[in-house]
Protein backbone atom coordinates (compact mmCIF):
# COMPACT_ATOMS: atom_id res chain seq x y z
CA UNK A 1 0.00 0.00 0.00
CA UNK A 2 1.30 3.45 -0.85
CA UNK A 3 2.34 5.56 2.11
CA UNK A 4 -0.29 8.17 2.94
CA UNK A 5 0.69 11.71 2.08
CA UNK A 6 1.20 14.03 5.04
CA UNK A 7 -1.89 16.25 4.90
CA UNK A 8 -1.32 19.83 5.98
CA UNK A 9 -4.99 20.38 6.76
CA UNK A 10 -4.58 20.53 10.54
CA UNK A 11 -2.21 22.22 12.94
CA UNK A 12 0.81 20.01 13.65
CA UNK A 13 1.93 19.85 17.30
CA UNK A 14 4.99 18.17 18.83
CA UNK A 15 4.30 16.66 22.21
CA UNK A 16 5.93 14.25 24.63
CA UNK A 17 5.49 12.32 27.86
CA UNK A 18 7.83 13.25 30.71
CA UNK A 19 8.11 12.18 34.35
CA UNK A 20 9.57 9.68 36.78
CA UNK A 21 10.67 6.25 35.57
CA UNK A 22 7.97 3.57 36.17
CA UNK A 23 5.17 6.10 36.49
CA UNK A 24 3.75 4.75 33.22
CA UNK A 25 4.86 7.15 30.45
CA UNK A 26 5.17 4.43 27.82
CA UNK A 27 1.95 2.65 28.84
CA UNK A 28 0.09 5.96 28.64
CA UNK A 29 1.63 6.70 25.22
CA UNK A 30 0.40 3.30 23.99
CA UNK A 31 -3.03 3.94 25.54
CA UNK A 32 -3.37 7.32 23.78
CA UNK A 33 -2.42 5.66 20.51
CA UNK A 34 -4.95 2.81 20.97
CA UNK A 35 -7.81 4.98 22.24
CA UNK A 36 -7.45 7.41 19.33
CA UNK A 37 -7.17 4.53 16.83
CA UNK A 38 -10.40 3.01 18.21
CA UNK A 39 -12.16 6.39 18.12
CA UNK A 40 -10.83 7.61 14.72
CA UNK A 41 -9.62 4.50 12.84
CA UNK A 42 -9.40 6.37 9.53
CA UNK A 43 -7.03 8.97 11.05
CA UNK A 44 -4.71 6.73 13.06
CA UNK A 45 -2.46 3.71 12.75
CA UNK A 46 -2.54 0.78 15.12
CA UNK A 47 0.53 0.73 17.42
CA UNK A 48 1.02 -1.78 20.21
CA UNK A 49 2.80 -1.27 23.52
CA UNK A 50 5.78 -3.45 22.53
CA UNK A 51 6.58 -1.36 19.43
CA UNK A 52 6.64 1.83 21.52
CA UNK A 53 8.44 0.23 24.47
CA UNK A 54 11.32 -1.06 22.33
CA UNK A 55 12.38 2.57 21.80
CA UNK A 56 14.91 2.43 18.94
CA UNK A 57 18.36 3.85 19.45
CA UNK A 58 19.04 7.15 17.69
CA UNK A 59 22.21 9.12 17.32
CA UNK A 60 21.91 12.91 17.53
CA UNK A 61 25.20 14.78 17.19
CA UNK A 62 26.98 11.60 18.24
CA UNK A 63 24.87 11.13 21.37
CA UNK A 64 23.01 7.84 21.74
CA UNK A 65 19.39 8.28 22.77
CA UNK A 66 16.64 5.68 23.01
CA UNK A 67 13.46 7.33 21.88
CA UNK A 68 10.08 6.38 20.42
CA UNK A 69 8.20 8.51 17.91
CA UNK A 70 4.46 7.95 17.69
CA UNK A 71 2.05 9.81 15.41
CA UNK A 72 -1.63 10.22 16.11
CA UNK A 73 -4.53 12.54 15.29
CA UNK A 74 -7.51 13.99 17.06
CA UNK A 75 -10.29 15.70 15.11
CA UNK A 76 -8.55 19.00 15.71
CA UNK A 77 -4.83 18.28 15.31
CA UNK A 78 -2.03 16.08 14.07
CA UNK A 79 0.44 15.11 16.82
CA UNK A 80 4.00 13.82 16.81
CA UNK A 81 4.65 12.30 20.23
CA UNK A 82 8.06 11.44 21.68
CA UNK A 83 8.56 9.04 24.55
CA UNK A 84 12.04 8.67 26.05
CA UNK A 85 11.85 5.68 28.38
CA UNK A 86 14.97 6.08 30.52
CA UNK A 87 15.78 9.02 32.79
CA UNK A 88 19.15 9.55 31.07
CA UNK A 89 17.48 9.32 27.63
CA UNK A 90 15.00 12.00 28.60
CA UNK A 91 17.70 14.35 29.87
CA UNK A 92 19.86 13.88 26.76
CA UNK A 93 16.81 14.40 24.56
CA UNK A 94 15.85 17.64 26.30
CA UNK A 95 19.33 19.14 26.40
CA UNK A 96 20.32 18.21 22.85
CA UNK A 97 16.96 19.26 21.46
CA UNK A 98 16.66 15.97 19.59
CA UNK A 99 12.92 16.46 19.87
CA UNK A 100 11.57 19.96 20.36
CA UNK A 101 8.28 19.90 22.25
CA UNK A 102 5.43 22.40 21.89
CA UNK A 103 3.95 20.95 25.06
CA UNK A 104 4.43 17.98 27.34
CA UNK A 105 2.28 15.63 29.39
CA UNK A 106 3.81 15.26 32.85
CA UNK A 107 2.99 11.71 33.98
CA UNK A 108 2.74 11.33 37.76
CA UNK A 109 1.66 8.06 39.38
CA UNK A 110 -1.22 8.74 41.76
CA UNK A 111 0.20 5.97 43.96
CA UNK A 112 3.54 7.79 44.46
CA UNK A 113 3.01 11.49 43.80
CA UNK A 114 5.87 13.66 42.47
CA UNK A 115 9.33 12.07 42.90
CA UNK A 116 12.88 13.42 42.51
CA UNK A 117 12.95 12.78 38.74
CA UNK A 118 9.53 14.43 38.38
CA UNK A 119 11.04 17.62 39.79
CA UNK A 120 14.16 17.36 37.64
CA UNK A 121 12.10 16.87 34.47
CA UNK A 122 9.87 19.87 35.22
CA UNK A 123 12.90 22.08 35.95
CA UNK A 124 14.58 20.96 32.73
CA UNK A 125 11.38 21.51 30.74
CA UNK A 126 11.36 25.11 31.93
CA UNK A 127 15.08 25.64 31.27
CA UNK A 128 14.96 24.36 27.70
CA UNK A 129 11.77 26.29 26.98
CA UNK A 130 8.94 23.73 26.76
CA UNK A 131 6.10 26.27 26.60
CA UNK A 132 3.31 24.26 28.21
CA UNK A 133 2.83 21.38 30.66
CA UNK A 134 -0.31 19.52 31.66
CA UNK A 135 -0.59 16.55 34.00
CA UNK A 136 -1.76 12.96 33.65
CA UNK A 137 -2.34 11.52 37.13
CA UNK A 138 -1.70 7.93 36.07
CA UNK A 139 -2.62 4.70 37.91
CA UNK A 140 -5.62 6.55 39.39
CA UNK A 141 -7.52 3.24 39.31
CA UNK A 142 -5.24 2.01 42.12
CA UNK A 143 -6.19 4.79 44.56
CA UNK A 144 -9.65 4.37 46.12
CA UNK A 145 -9.43 7.39 48.38
CA UNK A 146 -10.61 10.53 46.61
CA UNK A 147 -8.92 12.74 49.22
CA UNK A 148 -5.58 11.09 48.53
CA UNK A 149 -5.96 11.89 44.82
CA UNK A 150 -6.77 15.51 45.71
CA UNK A 151 -3.61 15.69 47.83
CA UNK A 152 -1.41 14.34 45.04
CA UNK A 153 -3.01 16.79 42.61
CA UNK A 154 -2.26 19.68 44.99
CA UNK A 155 1.35 18.55 45.31
CA UNK A 156 1.78 18.41 41.53
CA UNK A 157 0.23 21.85 41.08
CA UNK A 158 2.62 23.29 43.69
CA UNK A 159 5.56 21.68 41.88
CA UNK A 160 4.50 23.26 38.55
CA UNK A 161 4.08 26.70 40.15
CA UNK A 162 7.47 26.46 41.88
CA UNK A 163 9.14 25.97 38.48
CA UNK A 164 7.41 28.84 36.69
CA UNK A 165 4.54 26.92 35.05
CA UNK A 166 0.87 27.76 35.64
CA UNK A 167 0.13 25.30 38.44
CA UNK A 168 -3.29 26.80 39.17
CA UNK A 169 -4.69 26.57 35.64
CA UNK A 170 -2.88 23.53 34.16
CA UNK A 171 -5.28 20.64 33.49
CA UNK A 172 -4.70 17.65 35.79
CA UNK A 173 -6.48 14.60 34.35
CA UNK A 174 -6.89 11.37 36.34
CA UNK A 175 -6.14 8.45 34.04
CA UNK A 176 -5.14 4.81 33.95
CA UNK A 177 -3.01 3.94 30.93
CA UNK A 178 -3.12 0.24 31.71
CA UNK A 179 -6.90 0.04 32.18
CA UNK A 180 -7.43 2.11 29.03
CA UNK A 181 -5.21 -0.32 27.09
CA UNK A 182 -7.33 -3.19 28.46
CA UNK A 183 -10.42 -1.41 27.10
CA UNK A 184 -12.13 -0.51 30.41
CA UNK A 185 -14.69 2.12 29.27
CA UNK A 186 -14.30 4.39 32.33
CA UNK A 187 -10.55 4.66 31.78
CA UNK A 188 -10.79 4.82 27.98
CA UNK A 189 -12.87 7.94 28.55
CA UNK A 190 -10.16 9.28 30.91
CA UNK A 191 -7.63 9.11 28.06
CA UNK A 192 -10.13 10.77 25.70
CA UNK A 193 -10.50 13.53 28.32
CA UNK A 194 -6.72 13.86 28.53
CA UNK A 195 -6.43 14.35 24.76
CA UNK A 196 -9.32 16.83 24.80
CA UNK A 197 -7.31 18.77 27.41
CA UNK A 198 -4.19 18.59 25.22
CA UNK A 199 -6.22 19.84 22.22
CA UNK A 200 -7.66 22.71 24.23
CA UNK A 201 -4.77 23.81 26.41
CA UNK A 202 -1.52 23.32 24.50
CA UNK A 203 -1.29 26.47 22.35
CA UNK A 204 -0.84 26.20 18.59
CA UNK A 205 2.91 26.51 17.97
CA UNK A 206 4.19 29.64 16.26
CA UNK A 207 5.39 28.36 12.90
CA UNK A 208 8.99 29.04 11.97
CA UNK A 209 7.78 31.13 9.03
CA UNK A 210 5.96 33.54 11.36
CA UNK A 211 9.07 34.31 13.44
CA UNK A 212 11.55 37.11 12.62
CA UNK A 213 13.92 36.22 9.77
CA UNK A 214 17.24 34.53 10.61
CA UNK A 215 19.75 32.86 8.30
CA UNK A 216 23.14 31.57 9.52
CA UNK A 217 25.88 32.36 7.00
CA UNK A 218 27.60 29.23 5.69
CA UNK A 219 29.54 30.71 2.80
CA UNK A 220 30.47 34.09 1.32
CA UNK A 221 31.51 34.85 -2.24
CA UNK A 222 31.68 37.65 -4.76
CA UNK A 223 29.70 37.78 -7.99
CA UNK A 224 31.57 40.06 -10.38
CA UNK A 225 29.60 43.17 -11.18
CA UNK A 226 26.88 42.36 -8.65
CA UNK A 227 28.51 42.28 -5.22
CA UNK A 228 28.75 40.01 -2.20
CA UNK A 229 26.52 36.97 -1.77
CA UNK A 230 26.05 35.02 1.47
CA UNK A 231 24.53 31.55 1.40
CA UNK A 232 22.85 29.44 4.05
CA UNK A 233 19.60 27.82 5.10
CA UNK A 234 16.97 30.23 6.39
CA UNK A 235 16.18 29.03 9.90
CA UNK A 236 13.01 31.05 10.40
CA UNK A 237 10.87 33.87 9.07
CA UNK A 238 10.52 35.21 5.54
CA UNK A 239 12.56 37.86 3.79
CA UNK A 240 11.38 39.98 0.87
CA UNK A 241 13.75 41.46 -1.69
CA UNK A 242 14.96 45.02 -0.84
CA UNK A 243 14.49 44.38 2.90
CA UNK A 244 16.88 45.89 5.41
CA UNK A 245 18.82 43.32 7.43
CA UNK A 246 21.51 43.19 10.10
CA UNK A 247 24.60 41.00 10.10
CA UNK A 248 25.10 39.91 13.73
CA UNK A 249 27.85 38.06 15.57
CA UNK A 250 31.68 37.90 15.75
CA UNK A 251 32.09 41.57 14.62
CA UNK A 252 30.16 44.78 15.34
CA UNK A 253 26.59 44.66 13.95
CA UNK A 254 26.34 45.87 10.31
CA UNK A 255 23.22 47.10 8.51
CA UNK A 256 22.66 46.41 4.82
CA UNK A 257 19.92 45.78 2.24
CA UNK A 258 19.23 42.50 0.44
CA UNK A 259 19.09 43.41 -3.26
CA UNK A 260 18.72 39.89 -4.63
CA UNK A 261 17.59 36.43 -3.48
CA UNK A 262 18.52 33.23 -5.33
CA UNK A 263 17.69 29.58 -4.90
CA UNK A 264 19.14 26.93 -7.24
CA UNK A 265 20.24 29.77 -9.57
CA UNK A 266 16.69 31.08 -9.85
CA UNK A 267 15.75 34.61 -8.77
CA UNK A 268 13.18 34.80 -5.99
CA UNK A 269 11.14 37.66 -4.53
CA UNK A 270 11.19 36.08 -1.09
CA UNK A 271 13.23 33.67 1.03
CA UNK A 272 11.30 31.33 3.35
CA UNK A 273 12.23 29.36 6.47
CA UNK A 274 13.73 25.99 5.55
CA UNK A 275 15.09 27.10 2.16
CA UNK A 276 18.73 27.14 1.12
CA UNK A 277 19.35 30.45 -0.56
CA UNK A 278 21.87 33.08 -1.55
CA UNK A 279 21.36 36.71 -0.50
CA UNK A 280 22.98 39.56 -2.41
CA UNK A 281 24.04 42.26 0.08
CA UNK A 282 24.31 45.90 -0.95
CA UNK A 283 27.59 47.74 -0.32
CA UNK A 284 29.41 44.95 1.53
CA UNK A 285 32.77 43.50 0.48
CA UNK A 286 33.59 39.82 0.74
CA UNK A 287 35.83 40.50 3.75
CA UNK A 288 33.08 42.33 5.66
CA UNK A 289 31.15 39.14 6.45
CA UNK A 290 32.10 35.60 7.44
CA UNK A 291 30.73 32.17 8.23
CA UNK A 292 29.27 32.06 11.74
CA UNK A 293 27.46 35.38 11.50
CA UNK A 294 23.71 35.54 10.95
CA UNK A 295 21.55 37.64 8.63
CA UNK A 296 18.52 38.82 10.61
CA UNK A 297 15.54 41.13 10.70
CA UNK A 298 16.89 44.34 12.30
CA UNK A 299 16.61 44.41 16.09
CA UNK A 300 15.38 40.82 16.41
CA UNK A 301 18.52 39.28 17.95
CA UNK A 302 21.63 40.62 19.68
CA UNK A 303 25.22 39.41 20.05
CA UNK A 304 26.40 38.05 23.43
CA UNK A 305 29.49 36.45 24.96
CA UNK A 306 28.50 35.35 28.48
CA UNK A 307 25.70 32.92 29.26
CA UNK A 308 24.50 30.12 31.51
CA UNK A 309 23.81 26.73 29.95
CA UNK A 310 22.60 23.24 30.67
CA UNK A 311 24.96 20.72 29.11
CA UNK A 312 25.25 16.97 28.57
CA UNK A 313 28.85 15.70 28.33
CA UNK A 314 29.30 12.64 26.11
CA UNK A 315 30.47 9.44 27.74
CA UNK A 316 33.65 7.69 26.60
CA UNK A 317 31.51 5.08 24.78
CA UNK A 318 29.78 7.85 22.82
CA UNK A 319 33.19 9.06 21.60
CA UNK A 320 33.50 11.77 24.24
CA UNK A 321 36.30 12.62 26.64
CA UNK A 322 37.99 9.91 28.67
CA UNK A 323 38.60 12.08 31.74
CA UNK A 324 36.82 14.81 33.70
CA UNK A 325 37.20 18.56 33.24
CA UNK A 326 37.24 21.41 35.75
CA UNK A 327 36.44 25.14 35.84
CA UNK A 328 38.52 27.19 33.34
CA UNK A 329 38.31 24.39 30.76
CA UNK A 330 38.53 26.08 27.30
CA UNK A 331 36.89 24.06 24.53
CA UNK A 332 35.22 25.30 21.32
CA UNK A 333 31.51 26.09 21.31
CA UNK A 334 29.91 25.32 17.96
CA UNK A 335 26.93 27.66 17.36
CA UNK A 336 24.99 27.10 14.09
CA UNK A 337 27.90 27.19 11.63
CA UNK A 338 31.08 28.05 13.52
CA UNK A 339 33.32 27.31 16.50
CA UNK A 340 34.12 29.99 19.10
CA UNK A 341 36.45 29.36 22.04
CA UNK A 342 34.91 29.83 25.48
CA UNK A 343 35.94 29.50 29.12
CA UNK A 344 33.76 27.36 31.39
CA UNK A 345 32.98 28.11 35.04
CA UNK A 346 31.30 25.29 36.95
CA UNK A 347 28.61 26.03 39.56
CA UNK A 348 29.57 26.30 43.21
CA UNK A 349 29.93 22.87 44.78
CA UNK A 350 30.76 21.15 41.47
CA UNK A 351 34.46 20.29 41.50
CA UNK A 352 34.56 18.52 38.16
CA UNK A 353 32.36 17.05 35.44
CA UNK A 354 32.75 13.44 34.34
CA UNK A 355 32.01 12.07 30.85
CA UNK A 356 28.32 11.02 30.80
CA UNK A 357 27.23 13.74 33.27
CA UNK A 358 24.79 16.57 32.76
CA UNK A 359 25.59 19.89 34.43
CA UNK A 360 24.86 23.58 34.53
CA UNK A 361 27.74 25.94 33.68
CA UNK A 362 28.58 29.54 32.91
CA UNK A 363 30.47 30.25 29.68
CA UNK A 364 32.43 33.31 28.51
CA UNK A 365 33.08 33.29 24.74
CA UNK A 366 36.04 35.17 23.25
CA UNK A 367 33.82 36.51 20.41
CA UNK A 368 30.13 37.49 20.50
CA UNK A 369 27.52 35.23 18.88
CA UNK A 370 23.91 36.06 17.91
CA UNK A 371 22.22 34.39 20.82
CA UNK A 372 18.90 33.91 22.58
CA UNK A 373 17.70 31.65 25.36
CA UNK A 374 17.06 28.10 24.16
CA UNK A 375 19.75 28.20 21.46
CA UNK A 376 21.54 24.87 21.11
CA UNK A 377 25.29 24.34 20.69
CA UNK A 378 27.89 21.59 20.62
CA UNK A 379 31.07 21.57 22.70
CA UNK A 380 34.04 20.42 20.63
CA UNK A 381 37.71 19.66 21.04
CA UNK A 382 39.74 19.61 17.86
CA UNK A 383 36.63 19.13 15.71
CA UNK A 384 35.28 16.24 17.79
CA UNK A 385 32.01 16.71 19.70
CA UNK A 386 32.40 16.14 23.44
CA UNK A 387 29.16 17.73 24.66
CA UNK A 388 25.85 19.28 23.73
CA UNK A 389 23.92 22.03 25.44
CA UNK A 390 21.46 24.89 25.37
CA UNK A 391 21.60 28.46 26.52
CA UNK A 392 19.36 28.85 29.59
CA UNK A 393 20.17 32.47 30.48
CA UNK A 394 22.08 35.31 28.82
CA UNK A 395 24.40 37.25 31.13
CA UNK A 396 25.96 39.81 28.78
From Swiss-Prot:
Domain (tr-type G): residue spans on this chain: 10-206
UniProt region (G1), positions on chain: 19-26
Binding residues annotated for Mg(2+), in chain numbering: 26
Gene Ontology CC: one annotated term: cytosol
Region (G3): 83-86
Cited function: GTP hydrolase that promotes the GTP-dependent binding of aminoacyl-tRNA to the A-site of ribosomes during protein biosynthesis.
Subunit composition and interactions: Monomer.
Name the UniProt record assigns to this protein: Elongation factor Tu
Organism: Pseudarthrobacter chlorophenolicus (strain ATCC 700700 / DSM 12829 / CIP 107037 / JCM 12360 / KCTC 9906 / NCIMB 13794 / A6)
Name of the coding gene: tuf
Amino acid sequence: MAKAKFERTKPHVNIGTIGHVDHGKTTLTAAISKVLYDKYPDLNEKRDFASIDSAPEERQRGITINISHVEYQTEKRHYAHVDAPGHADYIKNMITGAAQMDGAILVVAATDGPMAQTREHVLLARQVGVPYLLVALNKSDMVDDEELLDLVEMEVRELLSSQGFDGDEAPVVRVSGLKALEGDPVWVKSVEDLMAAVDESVPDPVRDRDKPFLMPIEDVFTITGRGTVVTGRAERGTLAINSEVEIVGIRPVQKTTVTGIEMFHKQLDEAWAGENCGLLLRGLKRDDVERGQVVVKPGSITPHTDFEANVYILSKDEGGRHNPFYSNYRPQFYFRTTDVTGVITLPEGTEMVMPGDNTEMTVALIQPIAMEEGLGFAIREGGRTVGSGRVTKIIK
